[in-house]
Amino acid sequence: MPQLELSAGVVDYEDTGGDGPVVVLLHGVAMDASLWDEVVPGLSGEYRCVRPVLPLGGHRRPMRAGADLSVPGVARLVAEVLERLDLRRVTLVLNDWGGAQALFALGLGERIGRLVLTSCEAFDNYPPGLPGRNLVAAARLPGGLAAAFGLLRLRPARRLPMTWGRMSLRPVPARLMDGWLRPAQTSPEIRRDLRAYLLGVPPREELLRWAEALREFEGPALVAWAAEDKVMPVEHGRRLAALLPRAAYVEIAGSRTLIPVDRPAELLAHLRDFLARTDP
């Protein structure tokens, strides 16, 4: 997997290459780029798909001690990825992680031509739902993250409401989830990075100001929300679509937050339609 040296450390990324329009796909906490494994093959023939592994707990290379891994800090790293790879007019696709509103609030959206938000953190929904609150509570306790991720070695524990049970209707394949969880289960430095992110969420008032910054994005946008989401409220998807001046809104039935896991074919169809009928 290729690597990029960023201000916070070295990040891995996947890149299908090619001369087509660029689609950058981002994942959430305690995941990695493989979240999109069932979606990218349907795009890569026409689009260059870039998938960075963000330092959100599923990454395999610890960041530098003391690096800014707060929500705005990780948003700045996304902007660095786009700059280092000289990517312009990209279509930025997010699932679970809500960093888009931070990117625009920080004035870092100049390389983004189109935006796709799929069941992600928004407004003041940080940490999101019961799983998010449970993870932040663990991060505040000495040894809490080690215990929380140790519990997830037991596969039945992964379907509990306070862990991953509310994130998808069907279980995340064990191969994927084993890979997502292993870094935080085995590396104190990865847990340190994750703790920095989880405890680096700004106050509610600032989060709401960030969301308002999305009004300034003038490019085409698609908001695709899971109709049965238990973590990212469906109403948030509708509100995001109302904020974005050129947004289309769709709800995807039979899915919770992790639409790329629950309904990859339906999500791919919506993505391809959006990409075909809009220009960055």
Functional labels for PLM-detected ranges:
Residues 2-6:
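Short acidic-hydrophobic surface loop/beta-edge motif
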Residues 7-15:
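A short loop-to-beta-strand scaffold at the N-terminal edge of the catalytic core in hydrolase folds
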Residues 9, 29-30, 50, 55-88, ...:
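Flexible "cap/lid" subdomain of the alpha/beta-hydrolase fold that forms the substrate-access gate
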Residues 15-61:
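Conserved HGGG/HGGXW glycine-rich cap/lid loop of the alpha/beta-hydrolase fold
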Residues 37, 103-104, 268:
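Short, hydrophobic alpha-helix immediately C-terminal to the catalytic nucleophile
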Residues 94, 98:
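Gly/Ala-rich beta-loop-alpha elbow adjacent to hydrolase catalytic centers
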Residues 246-280:
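Catalytic active-site module of serine/aspartate enzymes centered on a nucleophile-bearing elbow/loop
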